[in-house]
């Protein structure tokens, strides 16, 4: 080793002696200090040497290489290196020079002024580190060595049940394995069981245990650790994996039926003795352990709260299990184990709890009706909302064509058109209730016979309406005929008397005015002046034409004419309190040959109901037209006045 040091020293100092022209200042310039430091590292300068210090660091964390230098020591400089790399040069008062740029930002001097602090650790940082310490007034260099190990932080371990071996004594042997994700370097394990003295620190990740149904189902926990971290698993109860033990051949189990939302009791009918250790109820694979006060729970550390704690209880008298306010998830297998101090083989009783919902009223629907060759076919479907798969259906009248599908009952019905089809009743059943619904089949398929009956009934109704209408029409006509006869029998003068000039009137009364019962009034007569034969013949011809026109109009309207005076008619209408007058021009009632200047018209509205009528412009059954001819004011000779009679005025009452 001394020869090696001498060789490296000669190789380092040789070039300096071969260049006498270089001054001493040039030789010991600061630039040459760094190569000199590397040479000293390679030479392994003699000094005090100590065994390596092992340091553990967490991946991504930080470590401190502590030198533990006395405060009284005077340090010239410290060289830090990680062979074959030089890391840093540290001078007094925390002055540090980073020699490897790959460590920029990761290296700094700690609080004591000399120790090295490294952050953001990576896997490649693992290895050996050296510190060369040079003190003032000390000839030898002190070396200190460190060994750095980098570990990952452990994640939460998990317990895996690798195997379960059931036995005939209602017990199982379990093999548990504790696993941790990530690296497993230097990871050790330990196992604990709650409320027991089981504590294994052998470092094995495997545990083999045996447990009986009568043993308390206490949870197991696995703990894993390495030099930089530790973590524990969630507690695991292992009896839930012992499914084979509860399938042991015993006496036939009992089926108990419960109703959703109502209480149920699983009767054990057991009397405890001194030898009885405890009674364990198991639902599926969850253990329900009895407590002294009678409450039942699956885990003392996870007791249900509030009403849920009181929902499942065991009886203090016979250890029966009582469940209130049943839920659908309560259905399943239950096992009662009676454990004894004298025997390790407990007695067991099995129960099967079924939970059903009270059925609602079923609904019956029909498919579109299909008709072919006089055969009517339809499919009726009966279903219950929320009934589940345990619902059965029956049809009344009994039918053999019902088919169950997806919780519904489908009934195929076919019959000939016109055949009487009864109403169908669908009844839904389950073990705790039943409910029925009736479907009326009277209108689902109407055949020709039913259509014939329908049209016949409709025809009879129409005939009845026609008879009633005819009866009222005949009655009305009879009343009108009676009125016409009464007016025909009224007294009519043999010849129409002449009235003075400007006062001749002719009245027309409608046969519809049954209420207008006015007797004919005798008109006042005035002597008619004599005239010559030509004038009389002309007047007679004009009068005959006027009578013919008026009788023709009256006959076309089926009216009766009567000759009364204008004053008498007005007096009669005024007496009834039903008269209104309005000047109108009935163009469709008066001959157009008459001079408009010589005619005046009034409208008399008659309300046969006794109410005050409104003036009407349109002709109706309550209107009486009265026409009065004005006397012409033409100059006539005395002879013409004596011979020509005045053209009579007339009134038309309709």
UniProtKB/Swiss-Prot annotation:
Residue numbers bearing the Phosphothreonine modification: 499
GO biological process: cell adhesion; innate immune response; positive regulation of interleukin-17 production; T-helper 17 cell lineage commitment
Phosphotyrosine, modified sites: 601
Residues with attached carbohydrate: 68, 120, 231, 284, 390, 412, 423, 434
Stretch list, region Disordered: 292-319, 517-557, 628-654
Stretches assigned to the Ig-like C2-type domain: 159-243, 353-453
Motif placement: ITSM 2: 623-628
InterPro entries in UniProt: CD2/SLAM_rcpt, Ig-like_dom, Ig-like_dom_sf, Ig-like_fold, Ig_sub
Cytoplasmic side: 475-654
Segments of skewed composition (Low complexity): 530-540
Residue span, Ig-like V-type domain: 48-158, 250-362
Extracellular side: 48-453
Span of the signal peptide: 1-47
Topological category with respect to the lipid bilayer: Single-pass type I membrane protein
Disulfide bonds, paired cysteine numbers: 172-242, 178-222, 376-445, 382-426
Subunit structure: Interacts with SH2D1A and INPP5D. Interacts (via phosphorylated cytoplasmic domain) with PTPN11; the interaction is blocked by SH2D1A.
Domain notes: The ITSMs (immunoreceptor tyrosine-based switch motifs) with the consensus sequence T-X-Y-X-X-[VI] present in SLAM family receptors have overlapping specificity for activating and inhibitory SH2 domain-containing binding partners. Especially they mediate the interaction with the SH2 domain of SH2D1A and SH2D1B. A 'three-pronged' mechanism is proposed involving threonine (position -2), phosphorylated tyrosine (position 0) and valine/isoleucine (position +3).
Protein name: T-lymphocyte surface antigen Ly-9
